[in-house]
């Protein structure tokens, strides 16, 4: 019978080492009697443990890269969709939630007039603003190009959600000088509230997008809620 234990120890000079302790128990004849005898083997496995940890970190990094937009480090479209589907499955009865679609106004014109490096600055500004306004505890994604989304799984106050969306637009307009544009960068926002506007990702996405389209058609640089259009 045997068992093995790996533990970290500290040497006299302060270095950390990982040691594997393997204990084997066998029955041997001692003084004409059959008695259990333990044999302990100690092996330095520091290199092996550190290599496994390094591989684990690399695998985690690769998984994270596959889940995120390479420029902004926000969730990419596929991951965002999967996250929202998971969160919708755990929604309690009577719980309200919101899907917020954000789309930059005249973004092609920004790229054409100022160049793609300024367009990239605008994209990064939006991603940073979304993190600042909504925090790191909710799902925020870049759905592609100049399209972003936020999913709020537990909405208590819809006016507060509108206020946050207004704050996003306000902060974006203030980025003009930092980005290097002659006019204020703006965006349009469409909001779908669940469960009445939808109970699936597809329903919420399309209804927030319909509200967004209404803003784009009428005035831009504003917010529309699906149930009110």
Where are these regions (language model features)?
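PAS-associated C-terminal cap
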Residues: 43-57
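Short beta-strand edge/capping elements of PAS-family sensory modules
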Residues: 34-38, 79, 96, 221
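Short loop/turn elements at sensory-signaling interfaces that couple input to output
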Residues: 21-38
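PAS/PAC or PAS-like capping segment
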Residues: 44-46, 104-105, 155, 229
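Cyclic nucleotide signaling catalytic output domains
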Residues: 140, 167, 181-182, 188-196, ...
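PAS-family sensory domains
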Residues: 5-16, 24
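Conserved long alpha-helical elements within nucleotide-processing catalytic cores of c-di-GMP signaling
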Residues: 63, 67, 76-98, 105-135, ...
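Sensory beta-strand/linker motifs that couple input domains to effectors
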Residues: 41, 100
